[in-house]
Amino acid sequence: QKLYSDKFGSENVKMIQDSGKVNPKDLDSKYAYIQVTHVVPYFEEKELQERKTDFERTHNIRRFMFEMPFTQGGKRQGGVEEQCKRRTILTAIHCFPYVKKRIPVMYQHHTDLNPIEVAIDEMSKKVAELRQLCSSAEVDMIKLQLKLQGSVSVQVNAGPLAYARAFLDDTNTKRYPDNKVKLLKEVFRQFVEACGHALGVNERLIKEDQLEYQEEMKANYREMAKELSEIMHEQV
């Protein structure tokens, strides 16, 4: 902002705080507008397998991603059964880091995810994060415990069980394509396995003062697995 304020005068520069799509017709031509949004590196599955270290995942990157939540009713946020999101993948002309701080975007690709696809995506991320934390050469115990705590929560309206109730419960599955329901079930199987493995890793690392905390998480895990088994009609 300072760069362009110095160039055009601060009274002529306006920041757009919303990272959504901007209609040029809504803008006043006498102002220079700057829109800033947070992006994260974007990798395909194959790339993730090749880029194993933190260094490899933060260097020589030219594709970035940001997501915008929306609902068909026009609201930004809604319940899990109505929450959609638009994913935008940006490809820059050069890889970061670069000799310049700003690099033009060569092209952008948009994908809209419907509610069950959002659930599949969010649960797949949880599985990948747990697996990555457990496979690190030096396990970050604080990060692992935070991730576990959020994963084995059995709250009614939050966490993984909210997705299971919304999309895998008998009264709801018929509303969604069979292939998406099957995929979400498979992701949940992987999720339960990843949580169990993460609990085992955590148990090996903790000291005596955290034994009670570990037992509490294990109890939550068993309760979550039990409820998932009832929803999915199979032992997970």
PLM features per residue range, with description:
Residues 2-236:
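Eukaryotic intrinsically disordered, low-complexity segments enriched for acidic and Ser/Thr/Pro residues
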